[in-house]
């Protein structure tokens, strides 16, 4: 599904990703964890070309998306992205937020887009909020709308960039529940997260990153019970 080979990314002279290579299978759920500044979010943003790599290749479903003339908008149609700070349109209702990309990018009819949006809102438990504007929603509700909006494009892959880190603690659970339900559908998911219990419970694999490199790549149970690297041991001791 996703093949990353020797991926590198720099901002000025600062090398953020250093020759990263990994493969993610279809239907696999991969949690990306590590200390702040380790390159986790940059790695995720490279997967849908929100950041353009300086070197290496990314291949998704046999298509190398890092080729110079790649249509980035086409790539993003098939990859849903959920951000830390929601990125909802403040001047559009919940329903309009979810319908926007299917109507304007995929050219779906408004009726079809609305039916799909309403169905997704039922799934994330927010159908009754469909005509509200984002400023009327809690942080957890905004993030659930953001997940529904990403799913409205029928993506093959979902990327989550610390989806709960901007939320009050009591709102984290409702967002994680929606994500758990998505895992059960067999969606391919890459999740940058600080929620270690969630990573342990739902991930098929854990990538531990530090200083722009993947230091460990393995089974969540083994990683959390007995990390191999000193850096991972130190990290887990501080947060668990």
Swiss-Prot record:
Protein name from the UniProt record: Arginine transport ATP-binding protein ArtM
GO cellular component: plasma membrane
Record bears the keyword Oxidoreductase: no
Domain of life: Bacteria
Example of a GO MF term: ATP binding
Membrane topology of this protein: Peripheral membrane protein
Family: Belongs to the ABC transporter superfamily.
Physiological role: Part of a binding-protein-dependent transport system for arginine. Probably responsible for energy coupling to the transport system.
